[in-house]
Every structure is written in structure tokens, then in C-alpha cells.
């Protein structure tokens, strides 16, 4: 396949209108959309992740929307492999594809590739998650600091997913996680073009407030309540869900 294929990535903050723009462009170009919003992968997370509506999904073919369960073990490495396989297949008939979503790491995995890591036995991850759930974020932060100070100084220390990912690699290989991070860009059969959406802060905040109000009206509280038994899952440690879990437990007002 010659490198005359184009992937258009539409990026921007939550609530700015990425979905609507992606659908508008996809219709004009007669093409399909791939989501890289890691929260929208999960079929149990509906209201709180604002996926495209049923009518929007019918208007344009979407991929990676509600294709996984919160009980599946799924990470950016799995996504990269599945998405690149699909993209190569779609490019047999299409010259342009649309990538949209707010998860920058997942978008980067498609456009540039991510470092290769060994397959980790599920029991190691489960043990670390249990450790995090029982002892809290500070414990795994300190563990990472002791085992890989370089990555500790680079990672978002509030992102438990990334800390656990690093710790499982360290535990399985006996090597620092930072040693695996070569940041070497992978060869792709397509060119990537990025559209970053922006708007005035006040206007964006008003949109987000309206969006949250709509979620509440649609039954977000009920959706989160039905997922309460699974709040220990890393997938549910996300904005819009963890706040309700804290509310249910009397930890916030």
C-alpha cells in the first residue's frame, strides 16, 4: 500500500463538539470514524461517556464504540493492534479515515505507535489493583518511586492506570519500566493530519455544564449506581463515575 492514505485526527477538550465535526467531515468524504476515546469502548458506560447517539451511529459507520466490557482486560497496546489491523483493511477501499476522541495516548498509538511491552500474566495486574484498592494511591506511588525514579518523575502521579501498568512491567521483568520506553516512532502506511478544536473558555465551560445537566436528566446517577459493585475496576476510576461513587459513600457533597 502506497503512503497516499490519510488519517484525520480530530482533537480538542471535552464538550467542544468533536463528534459533530467528525460526522460532518466523514459524510462529505464518504468515510468511516474510529474512536480513540478509551471510555467509550465500554458498553456499560453509556450516559457518562457521551458516545455518539444512535442516529449519529446510523448516519456514519463508527468503530470502537461500546465494543468492550468493563470486565475485559484491555489496554492501549491491545487497542493499537486492533485499530491498525482495521485501518489497514479499511484503507483498501478508503483514501481517508477519521480518528476522533479525547484520549491522547490512544491517538498517539495509532499515529506514531507505542513501545512494545511483554505480555503480563493477569494475576500480576489483579494483585496490583487489589493492592491499590485496599491501600490507596499513595502506596503504589511510593512503590513506583522506589523501583523506577525516572518514570516516577515523568508520569502523572494521579493516574493509577499508568502507575499500575508500570509496576506490572517492573514486577514481571525485573527491569525498570523506563528502560522499555524507547519513544521510537513506528512506520505507518498512512499520513496523519491533526485538527485541534478550540473555543473561548467561558463558552466551553457553559457547554460542559449543559452537557452534565443533560447527563443527570438522562439518568447518570442510576447508571453509576448500577455499576457500584464494580467500582474497584480501573475502568471506573474515571471522571463522572468516581465522583458519584464518593457521593454514595458520603465522601463528598
Cite the ranges covered by each PLM segment.
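Phosphate/pyrophosphate-binding catalytic cores of soluble transferases and nucleic-acid-acting enzymes
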Residues: 1-253
Amino acid at each position: 500500500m502506497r503512503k497516499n492514505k490519510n488519517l484525520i485526527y480530530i482533537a480538542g477538550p471535552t464538550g467542544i463538539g468533536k463528534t459533530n465535526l467528525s460526522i460532518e467531515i466523514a459524510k462529505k468524504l464518504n468515510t468511516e470514524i474510529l474512536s480513540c476515546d478509551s471510555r467509550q469502548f465500554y458498553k456499560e458506560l453509556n450516559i457518562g461517556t457521551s458516545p455518539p447517539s444512535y442516529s449519529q451511529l446510523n448516519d456514519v459507520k463508527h468503530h470502537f464504540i461500546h465494543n468492550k466490557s468493563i470486565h475485559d482486560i484491555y489496554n492501549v497496546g491491545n487497542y493499537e493492534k486492533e485499530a491498525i489491523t482495521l485501518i489497514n483493511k479499511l484503507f483498501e477501499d478508503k483514501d481517508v479515515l477519521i480518528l476522533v476522541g479525547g484520549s491522547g495516548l490512544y491517538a498517539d498509538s495509532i499515529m506514531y505507535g507505542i513501545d512494545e511491552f511483554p505480555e503480563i500474566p493477569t494475576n500480576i495486574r489483579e494483585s496490583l489493583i487489589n493492592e491499590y484498592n485496599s491501600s490507596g494511591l499513595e502506596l503504589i506511588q511510593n512503590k513506583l518511586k522506589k523501583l523506577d525514579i525516572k518514570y516516577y518523575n515523568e508520569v502523572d502521579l494521579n493516574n493509577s492506570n499508568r502507575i499500575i501498568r508500570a509496576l506490572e512491567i517492573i514486577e514481571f521483568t525485573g527491569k525498570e519500566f523506563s528502560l522499555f520506553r524507547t519513544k521510537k516512532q513506528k512506520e505507518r502506511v498512512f499520513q496523519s493530519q491533526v485538527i485541534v478544536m478550540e473555543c473561548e473558555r467561558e463558552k466551553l465551560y457553559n457547554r460542559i455544564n449543559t452537557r452534565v445537566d443533560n447527563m443527570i436528566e438522562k439518568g447518570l446517577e442510576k447508571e453509576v449506581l448500577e455499576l457500584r459493585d464494580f467500582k474497584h475496576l480501573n475502568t471506573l476510576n474515571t471522571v463522572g463515575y468516581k465522583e458519584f461513587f464518593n457521593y454514595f459513600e458520603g465522601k463528598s457533597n
